[in-house]
Amino acid sequence: SVMVLMHDLTVDRTTNGKGKVEDYTFEEIQRLNLVDRAGNVTPYKIPTLKSILEWGKDKVVFNFDNKYINTKGVSPEVKKASLDYYIRQLRPGGDWSMYHNIMLSVRSLDEALYYWNNNVRDVMFCVEISSEEHFEAYDKCPIPWDHIMAYVRMAVNPELSDVYRKLHDRGVMIMTSITGSSDKVKNAKDRRVAYERELLAE
């Protein structure tokens, strides 16, 4: 099988095709074209993951977010299989192991440790640290801070300034997510104000 880059489980929203990605062969999916935001068909094809990793080598940080982990209706067996697939690709000798610009978004310390304890070491882990309890848990775990990017949820929270200070003291960068929030504000000026409010915690 060939891994392709597709955000959704279906091709409906982003291509001129219909149906689930998994129902297409690679040859069939290469016949589709991507569409722009207005729905206009472009000359561009769905790229393979390998081609994008090569394109971004040494110049882009890729955030790999294993959606099977928190997708409703996915069995524990499939979730474990998806984790194990990532592990095979990221361990030395795996197809992704030569790319040193991959960050893994994980949903829990247990998930991060599953990767770490299975010898996935040459990646950054994007983990939620939005409480003192989160910080303490990661501070006590074997994953070194120089392998961690801290996700602090939807906005900077002044009440967590001590946690942010501790993270910065350990050289940890932090990031917020604005997906599903201010990015949906229609007016550009209002959207900028909303972004600044979230990012600066005014």
Predicted region positions:
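Second-shell loop/turn segments in exported
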Residues: A38-T42, I69-E77, N101
